[in-house]
From Swiss-Prot:
This is 2-C-methyl-D-erythritol 2,4-cyclodiphosphate synthase. InterPro entries: MECDP_synthase, MECDP_synthase_CS, MECDP_synthase_sf. Belongs to the IspF family. It comes from the Bacteria. Binds 1 divalent metal cation per subunit. The lineage of its organism: Bacteria, Pseudomonadati, Pseudomonadota, Gammaproteobacteria, Enterobacterales. Keywords: Isoprene biosynthesis, Lyase, Metal-binding. One of its GO terms (molecular function) is 2-C-methyl-D-erythritol 2,4-cyclodiphosphate synthase activity. Its EC number is 4.6.1.12. A divalent metal cation binds at D8, H10, H42. It catalyses: 4-CDP-2-C-methyl-D-erythritol 2-phosphate = 2-C-methyl-D-erythritol 2,4-cyclic diphosphate + CMP.
Amino acid sequence: MRIGHGFDVHAFGGTGPIILGGVRIPYEQGLLAHSDGDVALHALTDALLGAAALGDIGKLFPDTDPAFKGADSRELLREAWRRIQAKGYTLGNVDVTIIAQAPKMAPHIPQMRVFIAEDLGCHMDQVNVKATTTEKLGFTGRGEGIACEAVALLMKAGA
């Protein structure tokens, strides 16, 4: 078994909506990013890549490459997952924690889980997404942006 951890953060800026877990969430501000700014999928992709010892999302999809400008993070996740599977890994489970004062995430979490399960070709019971605040403390608590942490468990196929 291999465990990976991922983290991402983006500042608010511009106009909404924001995209988290592949879900478009209405909000007055967007997230500043080279791609679509989906911190949930970026953290998850990093966790998966880390567990497989394949580096990180910035190595695979550099923000200096114009090809990834405005990129759909679901596509990035699917490509990373293809590479991980090519190394002989299967998914145990993933757990994603979104850290934001606003907007409220609860109404959107079920669809995030659906999208992640679709993108990883796994069962819903292998995907958990939750959200928390920092009780108005720090960067996210002041409403300056959104952060996310994710962990992933991989297993060698047939092991």
